[in-house]
Amino acid sequence: MTASIRPVTPLQAAHLRGTPAILDLEASGFGRQSYPIEVGYVLPDGSSYCSLIRPAPHWTHWDPAAEKVHHIQRDMLDRHGNDIGDIARLLNERLRGLTVFSDGWAHDYPWLQALYEEAGLVPSFKLDSLRSLLTEREERDWEATRELVSRDMKGQRHRASADARMLQSTLVRLRGGASPAYT
C-alpha cells in the first residue's frame, strides 16, 4: 500500500503560521426561524470574499431590529443576493481543509448549517470559535483592542467581510503583529 502525501497549499501554509481565517455571517434575526443573509470571510493572506444570500422561498422570518444593525433590507437580498448552492460551493472550494473561526460561533454555526442544508451540501472546512485561539491575557484585552482596531477602520460598514477583517486584525494586534490592510 502506497501512502500519498498531499502538498500544502500557500493558503494552508499561511493558516498554519498562525493568522487565522475568519468567517462572519449576518442574519435575518435571531432564533430558530432566522437564516443567513450575508456571508463574508478574510483569509490568512488577507484576501476576502463577501456575498449577499438570496433567501430560500421558505425563509420568511425578518427582524427589523437586525436590519437596523446590518442595514441590509430584505428586497436587497432578492435583487442582489447570490444563489445558496453557488455560495456553498464557492465556500467549499476556497475554504477546503481549513479551520475557519467565528466570534459568534453559537449563532454562526446554525446559520452556516442552514445554508449548507438548503444547498444539499456538506462544508469542506471546519468552523470553530475564535475564543479557542485566545490566551487568558488576549481574552482580557480583546474588547479594548477591538475598539482600537474598530476606530482605525472607521468608515467600514457593519457587514460580514468587514467584520471578519476587524476580528482578524484584532487578533493580530493582540499578538503584537501589524494588522493587515483595511481594504
Give each language-model segment a name.
Residues 116-127:
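A short alpha->loop->secondary-structure connector
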Residues 52-53, 126-128, 181-183:
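Short alpha-helical "patches" and their helix-cap loops
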